[in-house]
Amino acid sequence: MWHVFSQYTLIFLLLIVIAVPLGKYLYVAFFEKGKIDRFFSPIEAVIYRLSGIRSLEEMTWKSYCTALLIVNAALLGISYGLLRIQHYLPLNGAKVENMEPTLTFNTVVSFMTNTNLQHYSGESGLSILSQMLFVTMMMFTSAATGLTVATALIRALSKKGKTIGNFYQDFVRANVRVLLPLSVIVTILLVAFGVPQTFLARMAVSTLEGGTQTLALGPVASLESIKHLGTNGGGFFGANSSHPFENPHPFTNVIEMLSMWCIPAALPFTYGHAVKNRKQGWVLFATMFVLFVMMLGVVYNAEQSGNPLVGKSGFAADQGNMEGKEVRFGIPLSSLFTAITTAATTGSVNNMHDSLTPIGGLVPLALMMLNNVFGGDGVGFVNIMMYAMIAVFLSGLMVGRTPEFLGRKIEPKEMKLIVIALLLHPLIILAPSAIALMTHMGTEAISNPGFHGISQVVYEYTSSAANNGSGFEGLKDNTAFWNISTGVVMLLGRYVSIIAMLAVAGSLVGKQPVPETIGTFRTDTATFGVILFGTVFIIGALTFFPVLILGPVAEYLTIR
């Protein structure tokens, strides 16, 4: 137990050591003129000149939102065309065929929404050109889109006016100043530890038995870096980060975990710098971290305890539940990876979630249902800010004061927009899950009938709604029904909340901040952190508790 505690503590300390200065860097990159402008501004100026972008033109929230949707729609259309003709394009040494229309729709929506749900196997479903031009490109642009939304919200809370910035400038800066430099660093580290980086699509090797085997290769390291830094999650190979070419070593495992965790963990500190009150950032970070550690403890204990039926059958169960796990990672690092990838809504996996114990599988489900414990790049911060505003609103009602957040009144207009985003999340999980469980098109995909089958279906839609992308991969989901239904859920889960929170940002930026008084409810204290924790926990529990009882909890009770 001590070695597990020491491993986790070291990784947590590394996270804080990375996240705090990274938060300051993000603040300088987006909000402040500094020394980095001398290096990056000339590069950005070339991009602005070639694309005709007027980067200094401020936008209202409507203009900002329109620009975001247009850019995303254009990228989606280009990507759809690429996958439909990939067979005829170069860098296709494996002769990969064109994608079927509904699978193409699901795939391009998945990567555009930062979900990376994969109803295909990476090494056989995409050519190297598609992996580079489509997958890697989308991983940058979808992560940058999320960062722009967080940037716009932070800007709205830290200034007074009618505008929230320039989308194109924020989008370019997110790529040039943040994602590209970090990706280069992580790529070099991964290559150093043995992750392949080559244009060779296939390689024939001799096996230990004297036979030959063809191995799939490609530019894996460069994809892996942005896959995790951008909280994307889509794997170059079907086995994702369980594959030895994606994640060959415990060191690469730690690098990948910290990569997908660092930007979501840094954004609260960026927010603290922007509002000139670093305590604000620490309160948000601490609240999310406590929620995360609680969930991690549950999944680790569940997996270490193993399946009770194994012990009852006379077999040794002291090694815990190693089904679906890599021996090189073991239960501790597999459990931590599971918690991080669903907390940060990345979706990459170093073990098979379908093989988790019932309670172990409940944890990634719960983290995606909450969708605000760090969350994805940008959007996770927006989600926790949404809950922070709800907490302030409820606290204000209880003491009979007009709720205020950073001196700005939270009024019915903002709450209506927040509630739309809040209620949509469970709706697009529970409604399609019910439809799938009531129809043959849905139930025919279930590989484990019974309570686990319910969990498989609910997990698929929860992962889609939270823009996570992981799955209980026993589900046979490459059908028209699953491709279209999850595609629609991914679109709604991504863009409705983005539009709603940009509207909230547009409303708040125009309000005159109210001076702080002795009666002001402060949001930079431990008291507010406790209230925020309770708000997240209670709303999540009340919303999803019934379906969790029907799935993982009921399954657990059957094997006790």
From Swiss-Prot:
The keyword Calcium does not apply. Pfam families: KdpA (PF03814). It is a multi-pass membrane protein. Coiled coil: none annotated. It comes from the Bacteria. InterPro entries: KdpA. The keyword Transmembrane helix applies. One of its GO terms (cellular component) is plasma membrane. One of its GO terms (molecular function) is P-type potassium transmembrane transporter activity. It is found in: Cell membrane. Keywords: Cell membrane, Ion transport, Membrane, Potassium, Potassium transport, Transmembrane, Transmembrane helix, Transport. The chain crosses the membrane at residues 11-31, 63-83, 134-154, 179-199, 254-274, 282-302, 329-349, 356-376, 379-399, 417-437, 488-508, 530-550. Belongs to the KdpA family. The system is composed of three essential subunits: KdpA, KdpB and KdpC. Part of the high-affinity ATP-driven potassium transport (or Kdp) system, which catalyzes the hydrolysis of ATP coupled with the electrogenic transport of potassium into the cytoplasm. This subunit binds the extracellular potassium ions and delivers the ions to the membrane domain of KdpB through an intramembrane tunnel. This is Potassium-transporting ATPase potassium-binding subunit. It comes from Geobacillus kaustophilus (strain HTA426). The lineage of its organism: Bacteria, Bacillati, Bacillota, Bacilli, Bacillales. The gene is kdpA.
